[in-house]
A protein has these predicted regions:
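Short aromatic-glycine-(Arg/Gly/Cys) micro-motifs in beta-strand/loop hairpins
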Residues: 1-17
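Short, low-complexity, polar/charged sequence segments that are solvent-exposed and flexible
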Residues: 25-29, 39-42
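Short, mixed-charge low-complexity intrinsically disordered segments
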Residues: 35-55
Length: 55
């Protein structure tokens, strides 16, 4: 897998702060976002309309 820009956010947060993180995988993007706030659990590749949730 190559490097991608991931949009990461907190599920259900009405005032969403979206982070953009460069990472190779969903897990790496979530791990980096959780250095800012442990609640980050949703991510999608920039320009892609599918997303994944980390439970």
């Amino acid at each position: 897998m190559g490097w991608k820009i991931w949009k990461v956010w907190v599920e259900g947060d009405e005032c969403q702060s979206v982070l953009r993180i460069i990472a190779q995988s969903f897990d790496e993007a979530i791990a980096e976002a959780r250095k800012v706030d442990v609640r980050y659990n949703m991510a999608q590749v920039e320009g892609d309309y599918t997303y994944a949730t980390y439970n």
